[in-house]
Amino acid sequence: MAKKIVGFIKLQVPAGKANPSPPIGPALGQRGLNIMEFCKAFNAKTQGMEPGLPIPVVITAFADKSFTFIMKTPPATVLIKKASGVQKGSAKPHTDKVGTLTRAQAEEIAKTKQPDLTAADLDAAVRTIAGSARSMGITVEGV
C-alpha cells in the first residue's frame, strides 16, 4: 500500500547551500521532517551545479515523517540575468532596456529549461525564454 501524503512543500534553495536556517528549517520542522537529512541529500544532489544557483524543489511529506523531493531547473529569470550580465531587470521593461541576449544564449537557456517547459520543441522554448527576457527589459537579438 502507498504511503499517505500529508503535504507538499515548495522551496527555492541555493544549490549546495541547504542548511537548517530559514526558510528550510521552519518549513520542514512544522511537518516533523528530518531537516538535516534533507539538507545532506539536497547538497549531495546539487554538488555538480554552480554553488548558490537557486533550485526550486518540491518536497513530498508522508504521514510516517519520511519525505521525497523533486528538483526542478533553475528559474528562467536567474539564467537570463546571468547570461546577459545584468543584476536585475528593468523597472520599465518596454521603455528602458538594461541588457541584451543573443539567440545562442536563449537556446542554451531553453535547453536547460526544456524539462520544465510545456513547449513542444526547442524553437518554441527559445521563444518562451525570449518573451521572459523582453518582459525583464532585455533586448533579444535574432529571435
Curated annotation (Swiss-Prot):
Keyword set includes Magnesium: no
One cellular component term from this protein's GO annotations in UniProt: cytosolic large ribosomal subunit
GO biological process, one term: translation
Example of a GO MF term: large ribosomal subunit rRNA binding
This protein's record includes keyword tRNA-binding: no
Post-translational modification: One or more lysine residues are methylated.
Keywords of the record: Methylation, Ribonucleoprotein, Ribosomal protein, RNA-binding, rRNA-binding
Source domain of life: Bacteria
Function of the molecule: Forms part of the ribosomal stalk which helps the ribosome interact with GTP-bound translation factors.
Similarity remark: Belongs to the universal ribosomal protein uL11 family.
Subunit composition and interactions: Part of the ribosomal stalk of the 50S ribosomal subunit. Interacts with L10 and the large rRNA to form the base of the stalk. L10 forms an elongated spine to which L12 dimers bind in a sequential fashion forming a multimeric L10(L12)X complex.
PANTHER family: 60S RIBOSOMAL PROTEIN L12 (PTHR11661), LARGE RIBOSOMAL SUBUNIT PROTEIN UL11M (PTHR11661:SF1)
Name listed for the protein in its UniProt record: Large ribosomal subunit protein uL11
Organism: Bordetella parapertussis (strain 12822 / ATCC BAA-587 / NCTC 13253)
